[in-house]
C-alpha cells in the first residue's frame, strides 16, 4: 500500500531493509545484542516518514468512509492511512511513530506517540518504568497483540478488501479465513497472489492507487 508513496517494503530490493539482516534489526535478540544499531535503524525509518505523503490509494480508502463503516487492518507501520484521513486503523505490526518500554512493550501506560521533533530516539531515553525506550514494533518472534481485534472485525465484515500483500506473512495472512463465506472479497495487487482454493475473489491486478480507483467505481454507484 505504501510502496507508491516511496516507502520500501520488507521484500522489495533496495531501501533500508537491504542494509541489514532482518535478524539484526527486527528481532528481540537483535535488539538485545545491539540496541544502538536497532535504535538508529528505526530513527532512520522515522525520518523517511517526513519525506513521504499518502498516495491516492490511501486517500481513496479514507474516502470510502463517506459511504461505509471502514476499518483498516494494516501490516504497515507508517502513519499514511491516518494522514490520508482514515479514522479507524488497526496496526498489526506496531507503529513507527511510537515508542514503548523495553520491559513491558504492550503496556498502554508506557506507549508514547512521538512528535516529529522527537523522532531521534537516543540510548538513555527512558520509559515510565525506567527501561530504555524501544520502537513500538512487533518484531519477528513476538506475539501480535492486535490480531484478536482484527479477527473480530473480519468475522463481522460485509465487504473484505485486500491491498498489496503477498498473503504469506502470518498471522495476518490467515485473516481471510475468518471472513464469512458469503462476503465479497476484492484483491488489489499488480502481481499474482495465491489465494486459498475454494474462495471466490474479485482480483484487480493493478497497483494500489489504480486499483482503488476501479474498486471505488464498483462499490460506489
What are the residue ranges of the model-derived segments?
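Conserved catalytic core of sirtuin-type NAD+-dependent deacylases
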Residues: 1-221
Amino acid at each position: 500500500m505504501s510502496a507508491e508513496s516511496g516507502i520500501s517494503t520488507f521484500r522489495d530490493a533496495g531501501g533500508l531493509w537491504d542494509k541489514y539482516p532482518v535478524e539484526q534489526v527486527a528481532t528481540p535478540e537483535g535488539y538485545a545484542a545491539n540496541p544502538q544499531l536497532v535504535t538508529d535503524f528505526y530513527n532512520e525509518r522515522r525520518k523517511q516518514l517526513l519525506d513521504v505523503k499518502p498516495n491516492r490509494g490511501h486517500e481513496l480508502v479514507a474516502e470510502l468512509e463517506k459511504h461505509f463503516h471502514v476499518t483498516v487492518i494494516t501490516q504497515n507501520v507508517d502513519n499514511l492511512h491516518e494522514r490520508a484521513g482514515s479514522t479507524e486503523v488497526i496496526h498489526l505490526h506496531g507503529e513507527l511513530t511510537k515508542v514503548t518500554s523495553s520491559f513491558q512493550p504492550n503496556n498502554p501506560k508506557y506507549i508514547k506517540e512521538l512528535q516529529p521533533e522527537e523522532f531521534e530516539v537516543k540510548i538513555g531515553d527512558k520509559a515510565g518504568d525506567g527501561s530504555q525506550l524501544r520502537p513500538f514494533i512487533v518484531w519477528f518472534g513476538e506475539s501480535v497483540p492486535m490480531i484478536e481485534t482484527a479477527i473480530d472485525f473480519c468475522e463481522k465484515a460485509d465487504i473484505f478488501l485486500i491491498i498489496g500483500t503477498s498473503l504469506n506473512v502470518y498471522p495476518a495472512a490467515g485473516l481471510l479465513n475468518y471472513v464469512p463465506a458469503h462476503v465479497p472479497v476484492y484483491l488489489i495487487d499488480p502481481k499474482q497472489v495465491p489465494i486459498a482454493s475454494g474462495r471466490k475473489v474479485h482480483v484487480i491486478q493493478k497497483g494500489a492507487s489504480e486499483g482503488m480507483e476501479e474498486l471505488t467505481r464498483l462499490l460506489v454507484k
